[in-house]
Amino acid sequence: MKSGRRPRGFGGNIWTLVAAAFCLSALALMGAEKDKKKVEWDASKLAPASDKKGLTYEKDIKPLLEKSCVKCHSGEKPKSKYRMDSLASVIKGGESGDAAIIPGNSAKSPMVAYVSELVEDMEMPPTDKRDKYPALTKEQIGLIRAWIDQGAK
């Protein structure tokens, strides 16, 4: 190769390559954020919270979840990576990274919206599994709401 000539191929400008890689990475991240939908629902359609006081996870809520939710949302590979077999995991949520329960605010807790069938394609339990796992009643949802509003303890 003669001195002063650029090698064949890319052209020798590494900074152009770095800038292009940076731009492509930024575009990929923007696309990923766009795909993550913000889930919204009309809280006015929720069943009213129960008047019952002193609700606890172990005594009042866990039995409801065991009947309708825990079979799919427990174990090594829970659906949507959301475990519902302990208080901490019920609150934490799953693969979305968002909390499923917001202690003190049942109307903004996604889990309540899902069991209330207010989010399309997120009805829980799924309608095609209701022969094995019954949907929660309005009264049961009201208990869950009251428990959350009381701090989800």
Residue ranges and their predicted role:
Residues 1-12:
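N-terminal secretory signal peptides that target proteins for export/translocation
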Residues 2, 29-153:
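Aromatic- and Gly/Pro-enriched helix-to-coil junctions and flexible linker segments
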Residues 16-26:
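Bacterial N-terminal signal peptides
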